[in-house]
């Protein structure tokens, strides 16, 4: 009864405003009630750490009860500690370990990443840099010079093209000291000129081809060697070991007439195949043989044709039209075409053929009806060179035909002439490059003019008109010009000529010795058409040259093969040399002002600054 009366009249543990003193009985009762009340409030979430949730609205009674709880806690604080401090300790939450864990994980990740970077830096070697701007390699005594054009291919996987050269080496025999000829293929490092491997072949060769060939693994380069009689073999470019050799029984009644051509995969094994053109003992009978690129086995029998024509062997070349039709171009002083579908059906002696051979080119097929045969006449009379030229902004290629009298560009779709240029005595195959600013491939060609001189001409690929020409002295055998494309889609052109007479200005201080009878390598850039850059010279006879690209350093290098022999039949010592183009331009290049120029002369510093910014890249349309 006293407890009920106390609760009704006053708050527990506080002075009654009416009585002015504490009631002991009521105080004891209220202590027990307060404990129950505090437990109930905490269980229901009313108070947490001595505070109410801010989002909940409390009525006055609950405020009173919270106040009672705070007072009760203060009264039971341990001795030696202030009641206020004890309350604050209860209100503080225990510190969380998550921030420490996150910091530890972050630091551990950083440490592991740094360790991995350091390990990779020491274990993974950096690509080797080409520090050899020049080198010279003596091949020894050879007879007949170089047997086939130089081929550049990365043989040792260092990212720099290496040089494959075929020549007839004179080996010293043990009897009477007589030298015997031996056809040799040598792979030289493009980095320093060292010999990577060397093998002997059973016969002379027409070509060594390494581009566009693969046995499924891009990391394993391969090369196709075509002989002058019956030898056709696929070699590993890394070691020189033979992968397969065509059985000569397939050429029993003929010999190889030209380098082999690479086809799309026609037998369905995933590897590109090969077609060869063979010539019988009695021309004009020729025949084609399809060869598996994977095994070297013949894909069926020989396909024979009777052709009419006299002159230089043309092709075989593979031409794919805009519709996807595949034709083989070939000829003897002329250009003819035959559908690969026809060769395949006759070789396999069946009417079915792969889906890729179903396409036809209507405009080409119209020309078939003229002679009522499988042969399609493209061009007749005096053909020396045939090249396929990628047409800009299309998937079609045009045909560039070179004769003794000029150039003819045929449209690849309908074989109609696009333009014709008359120029006499063209002595070398035109080289492709970008001279004009219309992004159309232009052509540099060389023509003999008599009196120990030659004319070098650049022809605009769109109009067929000459856009640059110069007459220079040249007494020796004609060599093909070369071109290298730059990053801004221009091309520099390289060609050999004898000493030009205009005044020379060196790009590098200091004199360069000159001797009479030197052959000079000149560079022409379309930005400076009135200036030739004389890069280097040679006293021996230059018999072959090529250019390679260093993709890593955006640089290029020129390869020259010279011989001491004064005639083709006389043996002489062969030498291969390398010249870095950027290094040559900046250190020993000399400016040659053309005589007929009317434009103001350019300062040496301006040319030097421009050349220093040049970056060379691989030619995208090079076959």
UniProtKB/Swiss-Prot annotation:
**Signal sequence segment:** none
| Localization, UniProt | Membrane; Golgi outpost; Cytoplasm, Cytoskeleton, Microtubule organizing center
**Pfam families associated with the record:** Beta-prop_FAM234A_B
Protein topology in the membrane: Single-pass membrane protein
Main localisation, per the record?
membrane
Annotated spans, Disordered: 1-82
Which family is this protein grouped under? Belongs to the FAM234 family.
- Protein's name according to its UniProt entry: Protein FAM234B
- Underlying gene: FAM234B
């Amino acid at each position: 009864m006293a407890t009920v009366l106390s609760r009704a009249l006053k708050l527990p543990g506080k002075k009654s405003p009416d009585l002015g003193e504490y009631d002991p009985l009521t105080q004891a009762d209220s202590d027990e009630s307060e404990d129950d009340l505090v437990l109930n409030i905490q269980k229901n979430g009313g108070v947490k750490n001595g505070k109410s949730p801010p989002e909940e609205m409390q009525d006055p009674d609950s405020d009173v009860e919270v106040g009672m709880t705070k007072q009760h806690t203060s009264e039971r604080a341990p001795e030696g500690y202030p009641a206020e401090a004890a309350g604050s300790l209860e209100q503080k939450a225990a510190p969380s370990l998550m921030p420490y864990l996150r910091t530890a994980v972050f630091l551990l990740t950083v440490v592991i990443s740094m360790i991995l970077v350091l390990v990779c830096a020491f274990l993974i070697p950096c690509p080797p840099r080409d520090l050899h701007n020049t080198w010279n390699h003596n091949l020894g005594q050879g007879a007949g010079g170089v047997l086939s054009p130089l081929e550049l291919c990365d043989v040792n996987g260092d990212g720099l093209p290496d040089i494959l050269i075929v020549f007839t080496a004179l080996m010293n025999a043990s009897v009477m000291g007589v030298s015997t000829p031996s056809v040799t293929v040598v792979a030289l490092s493009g980095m320093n000129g060292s010999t990577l491997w060397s093998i002997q072949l059973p016969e002379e060769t027409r070509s060594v081809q390494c581009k566009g060939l693969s046995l499924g693994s891009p990391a394993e380069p391969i090369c196709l060697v075509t002989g002058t009689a019956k030898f056709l073999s696929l070699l590993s470019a890394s070691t020189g070991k033979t992968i397969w050799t065509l059985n000569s029984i397939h050429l029993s009644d003929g010999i190889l007439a030209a380098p082999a051509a690479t086809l799309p995969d026609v037998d369905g094994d995933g590897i590109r195949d090969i077609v060869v053109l063979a010539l019988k003992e009695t021309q004009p009978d020729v025949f084609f043989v399809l060869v598996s690129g994977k095994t070297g086995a013949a894909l069926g029998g020989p396909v024979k044709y009777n052709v009419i024509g006299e002159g230089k062997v043309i092709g075989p070349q593979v031409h794919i039209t805009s519709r996807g039709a595949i034709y083989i171009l070939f000829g003897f002083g002329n250009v003819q075409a035959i559908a690969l579908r026809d060769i395949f059906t006759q070789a396999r002696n069946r009417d079915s053929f792969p889906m890729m051979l179903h396409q036809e080119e209507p405009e080409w097929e119209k020309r078939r009806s003229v002679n009522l045969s499988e042969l399609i006449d493209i061009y007749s009379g005096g053909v020396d060179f045939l090249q396929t030229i990628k047409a800009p902004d299309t998937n079609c290629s045009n045909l560039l035909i070179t004769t003794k009298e000029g150039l003819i560009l045929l449209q690849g779709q309908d074989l109609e002439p696009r333009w014709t240029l008359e120029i006499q005595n063209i002595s070398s195959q035109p080289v492709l490059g970008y001279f004009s600013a219309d992004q159309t491939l232009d052509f540099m060609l060389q023509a003999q003019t008599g009196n120990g001189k030659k004319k070098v001409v650049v022809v605009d690929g769109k109009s067929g008109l000459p856009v640059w020409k110069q007459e220079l002295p040249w007494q020796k055998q004609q060599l093909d010009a070369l071109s290298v494309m730059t990053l801004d889609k221009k091309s520099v052109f390289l060609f050999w000529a004898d000493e030009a007479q205009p005044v020379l200005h060196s790009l590098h201080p200091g004199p360069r010795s000159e001797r009479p009878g030197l052959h000079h390598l000149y560079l022409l850039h379309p930005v400076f058409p009135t200036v030739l850059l004389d890069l280097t010279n040679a006293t021996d006879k230059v018999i072959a040259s090529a250019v390679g690209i260093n993709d890593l350093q955006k640089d290029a290098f020129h390869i020259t093969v010279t011989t001491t022999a004064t005639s083709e039949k006389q043996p002489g010592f062969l030498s291969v040399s390398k010249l870095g183009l950027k290094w040559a331009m900046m250190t020993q290049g000399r400016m040659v002002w053309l005589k007929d120029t009317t434009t103001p002369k350019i300062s040496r510093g301006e040319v030097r600054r421009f050349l220093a910014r040049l970056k060379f890249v691989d030619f995208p349309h090079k076959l």
